């Protein structure tokens, strides 16, 4: 971490915020004045090096002619405190959780004014929760197991319609993912089905891809859905597909929003939600911890009980 605004103390604090561990630091060799050592915004960088690699790092600095600029100042500790000593005296000792809340204070006030204040308060309070284990994966399945290999080896691949519309932009990687999972992808634009709705009859699966159909001008996924609902030919084709007992459908991102707006023609969707503005009043793009609950889903059923971080936008 480079030493910049706030000097060494802020640099060490930011390292502690990210690592969720304490730091024991001795700045005696940096300056006679501990304030100068802690807050000087001079050119520098803090490196964390494994003890086994320390001699090699020191040798590299010596070869570069800057070995005298290298100072061993501390180590990570348990307890969550940033402790700084100067010639044996403790000159600073504060919990990193409290320091992070101070560090985040300005952002918190700006967020409370700009966004939903309750959401801002919740995010600010969560900083102090050092018991939060953070994002992690607890899986009920082995991700290294190739569960589709036996099916692919049969030579019979179910056909999946990779559906796209004007503004959709993730159909290529979606087709690649389904191909790797044992499907035969079929690239279909909504206008393809307007010309020949029977093409959907040859598919056992349908995936509505992500992007920004019609630029979301009519609402997220709404214009795409209404293209289907208000076109009698398309509506009949999709109703027939969803009514078949041998089909499955997946909507991702904008495609999920589109499928939600089609629920009047999809059996068993009475509990599906509408998508409204976020409570935070902002676009949210996060890496979120989710849990897979038991369900009859063909895609998620064998993953029940798993907890893992997923991208949500």
How should each PLM-predicted stretch be described?
Residues 14-19, 172-187:
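Short helix-loop-beta junction
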Residues 212-297:
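Cysteine-nucleophile active-site neighborhood
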